């Protein structure tokens, strides 16, 4: 789909789009500050960052459709951002051990007409009570690096999740139903490319 640009550096988002039989013409990683604003609620944070990612790429590709997304995990109102720090990832895993937490993914589509549409999905995930050995082993695996909440549901962490409610694809990084709905407003998606 030459007229679609994916504003993301996530290989998982590209894979998920391909599940919809959509291959964007370009994939551009937006470089922006993803800091949380003081008092910002998790869902609003995800929606704002998804919008900013899409708009940043759209500013250089105004004749294209640009799709951006952002995923955030949170426990209560505490946002657990992506991390590359072992101590931070350990803290996240200790915090969600045996507890429910939420994962919100927002997706934004900017159209050449000037339309900017955002949708978001909140899912609930519950980890089993994690032992120190399980946390240490998971940290050694390294699969938590760069992941919201300090874990990757598509990896070994899936064995540590006792249940989830909501959209699996959203937890991975792109809510497929919502993405399909956004794109089908502009594209005929009922064909095989």
From Swiss-Prot:
Its EC number is 3.6.1.9. The keyword Cytoplasm applies. Keywords: Cytoplasm, Hydrolase, Nucleotide metabolism. GO terms for molecular function: nucleoside triphosphate diphosphatase activity. It catalyses: a ribonucleoside 5'-triphosphate + H2O = a ribonucleoside 5'-phosphate + diphosphate + H(+); a 2'-deoxyribonucleoside 5'-triphosphate + H2O = a 2'-deoxyribonucleoside 5'-phosphate + diphosphate + H(+). One of its GO terms (biological process) is nucleotide metabolic process. CDD domains: Maf. The keyword Cytoplasm applies. The active site is at 70 (proton acceptor). It comes from the Bacteria. Pfam families: Maf. It is an enzyme of class 3 (hydrolase). Transmembrane segments: none annotated. GO terms for cellular component: cytoplasm. Belongs to the Maf family. Nucleoside triphosphate pyrophosphatase. May have a dual role in cell division arrest and in preventing the incorporation of modified nucleotides into cellular nucleic acids. This is Nucleoside triphosphate pyrophosphatase.
